[in-house]
Amino acid sequence: MLGMVAQWMGLEGQCANAVAPLLVSTEQGRCKSTFCSILLPEELQHFYIDKFDLSSESGCEQKLSLFGLINMDEFDRYSVRNMATLKNLMQLKKLTFRKSHRSYYSQLPRIASFIGTSNQKELLTDTTGSRRFLCVEVNIDKQGFMLL
């Protein structure tokens, strides 16, 4: 959470917030996605998104400049081939792109941080390591959680 706020404030220095917690539980209905969706207060909910399609890299880059928290819900659905793209996006500090019908490029700061959820424990497939993902096994007490 500190890294996310530092990213928003532009305090990350030369590095972007490139670590994403992955909430993991083999049981469905543990409110992992619900928990992610309420991390931001109501006033900032328009900066939260849980639709992140890696097939359009330019669309992904635009979301990095528009949203504060991107939930990669059901993280295990992302293919091994998409992981290289995702890792690259996670380390970007600034975004350079050309808007439609413009002849020049614009630079925008990246404000987005990532979080993810999965019902699979064996979801990191990179044989060289996965330093960008911090898997956290959760056992959320649904009854207590729903009181929030």
Labelled PLM ranges:
Residues 119-122:
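Short, polar loop motifs at secondary-structure junctions
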Residues 83-106:
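Conserved catalytic/switch belt of AAA+ P-loop NTPases
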Residues 20, 76, 103-106:
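Conserved nucleotide-state-sensing and coupling region of NTP-binding domains
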Residues 124-144:
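A short helix-turn-beta junction within AAA+ P-loop NTPase domains corresponding to the substrate/partner-engaging
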Residues 59-65, 99-117:
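AAA+/SF3 P-loop NTPase mechanochemical coupling elements
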Residues 2-65:
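P-loop NTPase catalytic core of nucleic-acid-dependent motor ATPases
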Residues 50-54, 95-99, 117:
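Short gly/ser/thr-rich secondary-structure transition/capping motifs
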Residues 67-91, 124-129:
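Conserved AAA+/SF3 P-loop NTPase catalytic/coupling segment centered on the Walker-B
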